[in-house]
Structure formats: structure tokens, C-alpha cells
Amino acid sequence: GSEMCIRDRLRPDPSSTPIVTDTNFAESYYQNLGRTWERMAFIKARPVSGNILKGKEFLSNISSFIWRNHFDYAAIDDVKNLREKMKLNSTHLKSFNLSGYNIKIGIGGIRDIELFTQTYQLVVAGRQQELRGANTILILKKLKEFGWLDNRSFETLVDAYILLRTTENRLQIINNT
């Protein structure tokens, strides 16, 4: 059977709070103490079970945390530091080697394309609401339409993303994961 991995550290102030907190606490935490990686996680967040309306209300209430009204160039350094930390903690990111290459987190993999896309979103989607969304390919298309990406970069990123996601899905089928 399949198992669901729950990462209990991915919550507001994990070292000092219970696994479940009320939404008022969570909203206050994110508005006052939330970090860039948490903003990135919420870019793709959506309610999938329980009270869907409450989930949508929560996301609406923290939208000013996710989407800053100013061009958030500090997010670029935060993402760069995040990527460096990821690199230190993964043998897949220390060098490019096709033998044992990890298409999800390896250099130039799925995560790199998503980090690239989400970094643009963090920087400019507070003002350009059309750049808000969870679909990486649609956001890349909008980045091209708004002049943030040239045609060649757009095509390269989209082609690579589709190839990597297709490969990932096929590997998951083969490995039953």
C-alpha cells in the first residue's frame, strides 16, 4: 500500500507549537514571522480536504504575506541561500553526474525550474496579479508575455519541465511510488 509522508516541521514555529494550531495563530505567525520558503510553499497551496471554504479563507487572509505589494528583490537572496542550503544537504546537488541523476532535485531538475518560476512570482506577483498561480507552465507563459522571459528561455524551460515531469511520472509508475 501507499503511505503519506507528513512533515510535521512544516508548520508555524514548529519547535514550540503543537502540531495543529488555530488559524488566527497561523495567520499572525505568517504575517509577522513567515519566511521566504514558507511564502514559496503557499504559492502552490490549496485546500484539498476538510472545510474547503475555511481553507480558502485562510489563504485569502495570508495573501498579503505571500504576495508583497512591492517588488521583493530580497526574496532573490533568500532563494539563493535556500538553494545553497539544499546543495549542502544533497549529494545530487554537489555536481552534475548522469549516473544516479535525480530529476526532481538534481542540478537543472524540476525543483530548479520551480524555484526559478517562484522566485519571479515572489518578486513581482504582488503587483502583477496575473503572475499568481500554482501551474508552473502557465506562469512561465505569463512571464514570457510580460517580457520577463525571452522566447528561447521560455521554450527551453517548458520543454525541460514537461520532459522531467513526464519522466518522473513514468518512474513513479515503474517504482509504484
Give residue spans per PLM region:
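A nucleotide- and high-energy phosphate-metabolite-utilizing enzyme signature
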Residues: 2, 7-177
